[in-house]
A protein has these predicted regions:
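Acidic, histidine-bearing metal-coordination/catalytic regions of metal-dependent phosphoesterases
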Residues: 3-270, 538-570
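Acidic/histidine-rich helix-loop elements
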Residues: 31-40, 106-111, 203-210, 215-220, ...
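Extended active-site neighborhood of metal-dependent phosphoesterases/phosphodiesterases
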Residues: 236-249, 253-256, 312-405, 438, ...
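An acidic-aromatic substrate-binding cleft motif
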Residues: 247-298, 303
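Loop/turn elements at helix/coil->beta-strand transitions in domains of secreted/extracellular proteins
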Residues: 265-268, 290-295, 323-329, 362-367, ...
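Active-site neighborhood of phospho(di)ester-bond hydrolases with catalytic His/Asp-centered motifs
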Residues: 270-274, 294-300, 326-334, 370, ...
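Active-site environment of divalent metal-dependent phosphoester hydrolases
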Residues: 277-280, 303-306, 332-341, 375-379, ...
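Active-site-proximal segments of metal-dependent phosphoesterases and phosphodiesterases across multiple
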Residues: 407-451, 461
Length: 570
């Protein structure tokens, strides 16, 4: 009986050692957060920055020594010792998860199982090399030829890049300038194109179809799709592409009806920000809104863009709320910068080339999208000297100056601006003071009717003329009895924040536990020149809101006079 118990102890200790290493390695998106939690960035020792790497190496050393020493000595006390060590490290992993990594578990679990798959492959090789020769199975022809056959098939399929092509992420129609960018993805490397009214528009690179990509982004004229009100995406897998010929797979297609922006009954739009993978809650909120002309997604739909699937998550959310039937406007968030695919994100969403600032035009709507990039200044420790946004910010200031000189916005009845990081709100760290001040000054000249923003994971309503600019803020006493050392810029336009998880204004759920994502619905009356703003939660309820930094309660509906920018509420 004792031998059985010690054998169980040995196995459990080794399994825990494997789990600790694989799980902590999968937590890579949270490593900088660990350093931050324990104080790095506040004049603490540099070793704190490298502590997560040191811990990961320590987990590896424990695992290897567990495997080697148990093999050499096979002592019961050794098994118990390693079980205790592995259990203590398991507690460390659980504490890290509890302190914040739990909000990233939807990233971490896929990475964990990916590592587990690699481990399974290594163990299979170990079995073939060290265990199989000692078994009676080596004399079994059926087993030997079965293994050989499976390995041969796997190698052939790998070499041929075998897959059955299909559309994995449905088409989303992004609005950029006077064009729509239709984006969809496939599980195989393939060519893609869009058919509208019998005319094909191709995903090309300098005249040649892109054949070795899984994400397909095709530009079409707005007027063409608005008139046709339907489009079909096509894809063909690239089986073989040689210098003098090739073979393409069968044509796979999907047809979607499209509803262009119709302002005959005014303008209605729905916006979300800081979804952070809560796509089901976002879809639920949108389901309660009967009609909207377009969608605005103001960034941070995910927390880290590390993989191809992460980059496609933007289109997953966009499709859930638009069904590919209405246009989507996208603004990049600070989390959308992070990860391996952050540099490739412009291929997956609406963007002007590789830039995330641009204008867009609908019937009676002039729109601007701005992008501050990261949420801290360039010298912030988390960016490890990889952030250099000064020129990018200046380019956007020049862009706004050019727009003012052209005055093209005067041809449109409604002026909408979008930026993930709030432009009129300067936080207590005083980040981006120059660019926010300059952007505010320029937007003040453009008769902006609404600036949508996110980032803070709160509902903040910035009403022009209500709070003295450039002065320390005091919280609404109904919300919090405290002051805030940030301030507001000197702005003359309404700005609404749309980044709140939860059901109510004061809810503060962890992202991983959020049962609701609050969105903002705006109904613009072009006859009376007003806009009515309503926050909705995932139960379809109107959210009762207040001004966070002023003693003012707005209720569930806010109506703004677009001429005077005066707010009335009920």
């Amino acid at each position: 009986m004792k031998n059985v118990i010690y054998k169980i102890i040995r196995i459990v200790g080794t399994v825990l050692a494997f789990f600790n290493l694989l799980m902590f390695y999968a937590m890579r998106p949270c490593w900088s957060g660990i350093s931050k939690t324990i104080g790095y960035g506040t004049n603490k020792p540099t070793i704190l920055y490298y502590l997560p790497i040191i811990i990961c190496v320590l987990f590896l050393v424990v695992l290897l020594s567990d495997l080697i020493l148990k093999k050499i000595f096979n002592k019961n006390w050794l098994h118990i010792t390693y079980l205790v060590i592995s259990f203590l490290f398991f507690v460390v992993v659980m504490v890290v998860i509890k302190l914040g990594a739990i909000d990233y578990m939807r990233f971490i679990w896929p990475k964990f199982f990916e590592s587990l798959a690699y481990l399974a492959g290594i163990l299979f090789l170990y079995f073939l090399i060290f265990i199989y020769p000692k078994l009676g199975l080596k004399e079994n022809k059926f087993f030997k030829y079965g293994i050989l056959g499976l390995c041969s098939i796997a190698v052939v399929l790998f070499l041929l890049h075998f897959s059955i092509n299909r559309i994995t992420y449905n088409p989303v129609v992004y609005a950029v300038e006077d064009k729509y960018q239709i984006v969809f993805s496939t599980n195989s490397e393939a060519k893609g194109w869009v058919e509208i009214g019998g005319v094909n528009y191709y995903d090309t690179y300098n005249g040649s179809d892109k054949k070795f990509t899984k994400v397909h982004k095709i530009e079409v004229p707005m007027a063409t799709l608005d008139t046709s009100k339907s489009y079909t995406v096509h894809t063909q897998r690239s089986i073989y592409c040689g210098p003098f010929g090739g073979f393409m797979g069968r044509d796979i297609s999907k047809t979607t009806s499209f509803r262009p922006v119709d302002t005959s009954d005014g303008i209605q739009y729905l916006s979300f920000s800081d979804v952070h993978m809560n796509d089901r809650q976002t879809e639920k909120t949108a389901s309660f809104i009967e009609k909207y002309d377009f969608i605005v997604l103001a960034g941070d739909l995910i927390s880290d863009v590390e993989t191809f699937e992460d980059a496609n998550f933007f289109n997953k959310v966009a499709y859930k709320v638009s069904k590919g039937e209405v246009p989507v406007v996208y603004a990049r968030g600070n989390h959308d910068v992070k990860g391996r695919y952050g540099e490739e994100l412009h291929k997956f969403v609406g963007a002007k080339g590789d830039q995330f600032y641009y204008n867009f035009y609908f019937n009676d709507v002039y729109g601007l999208v701005l992008d501050l990039g990261e949420d801290h200044d360039d010298d912030w420790w988390e960016y490890y000297d990889t952030a250099h946004y000064a020129d990018y910010h200046e380019a956007q200031i020049s862009f706004l100056e050019e727009e003012i000189n052209k005055k093209n916005y005067d041809n449109y009845k409604y002026h909408l601006a979008v930026a993930h990081v709030p432009i009129v709100f300067v936080n207590y760290r005083k980040n981006h003071v120059h660019v926010k001040t300059e952007m505010t000054r320029l937007l003040n000249q453009m008769d902006i009717d609404m600036l949508l923003c996110g980032h803070q994971h709160d509902i903040m309503i910035f009403e022009p003329g209500l709070i003295e600019p450039n002065t320390k803020l005091t919280y609404n006493s109904a919300y919090k009895d405290d002051t805030y050392s940030g301030y507001l810029t000197d702005f003359n336009f309404p700005s609404f924040m749309i980044s709140k998880p939860g059901y109510t204004f004061s809810d503060e759920p962890a992202l991983s536990k959020a049962k609701s994502q609050i969105g903002l619905y705006v109904d613009v009356d072009l006859v009376n020149n007003t806009e009515t703003c309503i926050y909705y939660n995932s139960r379809g309820e109107k959210v009762d809101v207040m001004n966070m930094y002023y003693e003012k309660h707005y209720g569930t509906e806010i109506t703004i006079d677009l001429n005077t920018k005066v707010f009335t509420s009920r």
